[in-house]
């Protein structure tokens, strides 16, 4: 049986990046990378540091992204739902909240069998009428939910700045 030997001058507090297998860091529904199945760093070498999981662009950066935007004339939410068909998605407005729900039962893919489900909630800004909200699904699997913002009534007005000679903050008396 092999035993990893650590040199006495290498102390664990100085190696905060030492980490065991990243098997549980995976994003559910995505396949494992070969590096997820490598032995832990201590069995390889005391000098080996596994790269952080957030650097794995294909499985981390590509899927499940959600972006909410509040622009001058509209409010929009873009959500990556490429693993779901339109029949497996629901978009509802409850009061001042948009709820997006997606669910598909177990089915086979290239890695085995998988089922997925998610719930997302987004607060509707006060200047967006919930009755005007619409949704659409693009060909590449991005769900867009948006609504127009109410225009501010009244003309724009510039407010003049006056200068005062006394300070806004007075010094506290010294003890």
UniProtKB/Swiss-Prot annotation:
Ranges that cross the membrane: none
GO biological process: apoptotic process involved in morphogenesis; cellular response to gamma radiation; lens development in camera-type eye; microtubule polymerization or depolymerization; muscle contraction; muscle organ development; negative regulation of amyloid fibril formation; negative regulation of apoptotic process
Reported effect, residue 154 to S: In CMD1II and MFM2; uncertain significance
Keyword Acyltransferase: no
Compartment(s) of residence: Cytoplasm; Nucleus; Secreted; Lysosome
InterPro entries to which the protein is assigned, alphabetical: A-crystallin/Hsp20_dom, ACD_alphaB-crystallin, Alpha-crystallin/HSP_16, Alpha-crystallin/sHSP_animal, Alpha-crystallin_N, HSP20-like_chaperone
Domain of life: Eukaryota
Effect of residue 171 to T: In CTRCT16; uncertain significance
Secretion signal span: none
PROSITE patterns to which the protein is assigned, alphabetical: SHSP (PS01031)
Domain sHSP: from-to ranges: 56-164
Tissue: Lens as well as other tissues. Expressed in myocardial tissue.
Entry-annotated residues carrying N6-acetyllysine: 92, 166
Sequence positions that bind Zn(2+) 1: 83, 111, 119
Glycosylation site list: 41, 170
N-acetylmethionine found at: 1
Region (Disordered): 146-175
Similarity remark: Belongs to the small heat shock protein (HSP20) family.
Disorder named in the UniProt entry: Myopathy, myofibrillar, 2: A form of myofibrillar myopathy, a group of chronic neuromuscular disorders characterized at ultrastructural level by disintegration of the sarcomeric Z disk and myofibrils, and replacement of the normal myofibrillar markings by small dense granules, or larger hyaline masses, or amorphous material. MFM2 is characterized by weakness of the proximal and distal limb muscles, weakness of the neck, velopharynx and trunk muscles, hypertrophic cardiomyopathy, and cataract in a subset of patients.
PANTHER family: ALPHA-CRYSTALLIN B CHAIN (PTHR45640:SF5), HEAT SHOCK PROTEIN HSP-12.2-RELATED (PTHR45640)
Its job: May contribute to the transparency and refractive index of the lens. Has chaperone-like activity, preventing aggregation of various proteins under a wide range of stress conditions. In lens epithelial cells, stabilizes the ATP6V1A protein, preventing its degradation by the proteasome.
Name by which UniProt lists this protein: Alpha-crystallin B chain
Organism: Homo sapiens
